[in-house]
Structures are given as C-alpha cells and as structure tokens.
C-alpha cells in the first residue's frame, strides 16, 4: 500500500560540534518517535555528520558538558569509532535508543557511510542500530585521552544502559569504497586506465 509523507521539515544544526539548534531538533524528533504506533513504518536516512546533529544528552548530563567532552574528543586524535562509543554513552538517542523509542512501529534505516569500515553502529553513532560493547568502554577511552569528567557524568554513563536488540532492517546505500568503484568504472567506460 502506497503512503504519502504527511509532512517534512528541515532544521539546520552545527557540525562537528553540537549546538542548541541540534538539541532542539533532536528533542522534537525523539518526542515524535515516542508517539509512533504499531501501525507506523518509519524510514530513517542517516549519513555522515549525524553524530553531532543528533544530540540529546543522557539523564544527568548537561548539554554544555556533552558539548565540551565532544570538543575535547575532536581535538584528542581519537578515532571516529572511539569518539562514537563515547557519544553513545552520553546520549538518550544514539546506540539504538531511537529505534527503542520508535518501537513497536516498524523502522527501516538507510545509511550513507563516511567512516572507515562502514560499521552501521558507528554511522551517526547508530541511533537505530544495536550497539556493541558497554559504557565502561567510554570511561576507558576518556581516560586514555586524558579527558576528565565529573563523578556525576561517570555515574550517568554507567547508568545509561544500551537498549535490547530490536530487529530492524538497515541498508547501506553508499560507502567510500562503493564511490571509488563507481568512479573507476566510469573512468574505464570513458577510456581511462
């Protein structure tokens, strides 16, 4: 059965450091997600930059604290995988928590990867993808990169449990490797070697 999109809305936000516009947009998205019913089918497109655009701090974490930790991670030299592990542990929406909020509605996720390895859990910090690992991994990463956090934030990280596995299909639309393969094919078809 063909359905029409009832409405759409574009909200600009900041990248690579989250801002208040992103926070407000994420609150609206999360509240809308929680209203989904068993009869709804949510289609979610996620691509590079979503880790900073989707920002909703975990309980006990202030937006400014999360923003500060994010900025310190950006300047630390940590890999994107490690940054996204920490971002998930500080979030109400990442690491599959958006899919959990949408349940029992159906959800299908389409992804465009810009990260090495194309791990769906790391694209946008995986808001609709079950994350692996535990939040104590975040504490280890923060310690390794000498990023200090308060006891309140440490407690919040440890209490922010990952959701149960939700069976939701996800499809990779594009990766850097796919782009390179297509560019090479196009070049060969144009007579280049």
Predicted regions and their residues:
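A glycine- and small-aliphatic-rich helix-loop capping segment at beta-alpha/alpha-beta transitions
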Residues: 7-10, 30, 34, 57-68, ...
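Short, small-residue-biased leader/transition segments that mark boundaries at the very start
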Residues: 2-6
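Short, acidic/small-residue loops that bind anionic groups at enzyme active sites
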Residues: 59-84
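A structural-propensity feature for long, helix-poor, extended segments
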Residues: 7-20
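Accessory alpha-helical/coil subdomains and C-terminal extensions
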Residues: 105-108, 130-193
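Generic structural signal for well-ordered, non-membrane alpha-helical segments
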Residues: 18, 22-29, 39, 62-66, ...
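Hydrophobic alpha-helical hairpins/lids featuring a short glycine-rich hinge
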Residues: 18-60, 72
């Amino acid at each position: 059965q063909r359905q029409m999109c009832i409405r759409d809305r574009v909200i600009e936000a900041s990248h690579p450091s989250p801002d208040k516009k992103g926070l407000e947009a994420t609150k609206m998205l999360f509240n809308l997600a929680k209203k989904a019913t068993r009869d709804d089918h949510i289609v979610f497109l996620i691509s590079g930059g979503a880790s900073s655009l989707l920002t909703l701090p975990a309980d006990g974490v202030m937006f400014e604290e999360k923003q500060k930790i994010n900025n310190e991670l950006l300047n630390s030299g940590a890999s994107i995988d490690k940054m996204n592990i920490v971002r998930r542990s500080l979030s109400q929406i990442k690491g599959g928590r958006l899919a959990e909020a949408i349940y029992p509605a159906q959800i299908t996720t389409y992804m465009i990867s810009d990260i090495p390895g194309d791990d769906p859990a790391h694209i946008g910090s995986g808001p609709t993808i079950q994350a692996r690992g535990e939040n104590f991994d975040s504490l280890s990463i923060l310690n390794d990169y000498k990023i200090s956090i308060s006891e309140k934030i440490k407690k919040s990280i440890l209490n922010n449990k990952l959701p149960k596995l939700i069976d939701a299909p996800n499809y990779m639309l594009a990766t850097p490797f796919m782009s390179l393969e297509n560019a090479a094919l196009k070049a060969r078809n144009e007579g280049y070697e």
